[in-house]
Amino acid sequence: MSGLRTLLGLGLLVAGSRLPRIASRQSVCRAGPIWWGTQHRSSETMASAAVKYLSQEEAQAVDEELFNEYQFSVDQLMELAGLSCATAIAKAYPPTSMSKSPPTVLVICGPGNNGGDGLVCARHLKLFGYQPTIYYPKRPNKPLFTGLVTQCQKMDIPFLGEMPPEPMMVDELYELVVDAIFGFSFKGDVREPFHSILSVLSGLTVPIASIDIPSGWDVEKGNPSGIQPDLLISLTAPKKSATQFTGRYHYLGGRFVPPALEKKYQLNLPAYPDTECVYRLQ
C-alpha cells in the first residue's frame, strides 16, 4: 500500500475519513451540481426528444463523411471533442463547487480515439483550474497520440504507472473520474486491463463523467449492470444507448457538424446558445 501511495505522489490516505466531494452552497442558479441537494437547471437546458439518437452504423457513417467528404482530420475533431468534454465537466462540476483546490480528476484513457479525446480533455481541464491525473495503460505508437501525451507532460499533468486497485482509494484521491476508455466503435469483449478498471469504476462513490458512451455499454442497448456515470457527454449526436442513461447531466458536445450533413441524417441538433460548444440535453 505505501509503495502505491509513493507512486501516486499524493501522500498518506487518512483512514476512516471521507471529505464531502461537493461543498455546500447557497441557492444559486448555475450549471454546477449540489451533490446532496436540489439543483436549478441552466437556462440552456431543453427537452432532448427531438434530437436523433444514432445507431452504431449511423454514427460510423456520419464520422466517415466528416473525414472523407468534408475533409476533417482526426486531430482536428479530437481537439474539438476534448474541449467540449472539458467544458461540459466545468459546467457540471465547477471548480468552486469542489472540496479540494485545485479539484483532483482522474482521466482514464483507452487505446483508441476516445482515449485521445480524454488526453485533450485533461489538457483543457488543467487550463480550467483542475488538477488532472491520467491513467493511459495501452498507448498507440502513433505520432498523434504521442504528441498528445507530450503536451500533457509539458503541462505537468502526471501519468499513473498503475491503477489504484480499490474503489475506496480512487474515492479518497480524486473528486471526479473521466471515463475515456471506449467509444461508439468498440465491439467485442472487454479485455484486461480494462475489465479490471471497469470493475473498480463500478464501485466508486465519486461521480464518473463518460465521453460519448459509458465504457462497456452496448452502443445501442446500453448496460444496466455496467458503470453508471453521473455525466454523459455525447459527441456529434447522442447514441441510442444514451436513452438508458440515468445520471444527472447529459451534454451534447462537438459543435462542428456541417448543416448539410445534419440535414442529410436528420440529426435535429439543438441550437447552441451564443458561442457555446456544448448543449445540455438533460
Curated annotation (Swiss-Prot):
Residues 59-269 form the YjeF N-terminal domain. It comes from the Eukaryota. The keyword Transmembrane does not apply. GO terms for biological process: lipid transport; membrane raft distribution; metabolite repair; negative regulation of angiogenesis; nicotinamide nucleotide metabolic process; regulation of cholesterol efflux; sprouting angiogenesis. It is found in: Mitochondrion; Secreted. The modification N6-succinyllysine is found at K138. Its main location: mitochondrion. Its cofactor is K(+). The keyword Transit peptide applies. Binds 1 potassium ion per subunit. Signal peptide: none annotated. Keywords: Isomerase, Lipid transport, Metal-binding, Mitochondrion, NAD, NADP, Nucleotide-binding, Phosphoprotein, Potassium, Secreted, Transit peptide, Transport. Catalyzes the epimerization of the S- and R-forms of NAD(P)HX, a damaged form of NAD(P)H that is a result of enzymatic or heat-dependent hydration. This is a prerequisite for the S-specific NAD(P)H-hydrate dehydratase to allow the repair of both epimers of NAD(P)HX. Accelerates cholesterol efflux from endothelial cells to high-density lipoprotein (HDL) and thereby regulates angiogenesis. Homodimer. Interacts with APOA1 and APOA2. This is NAD(P)H-hydrate epimerase. It comes from Rattus norvegicus (Rat). The gene is Naxe.
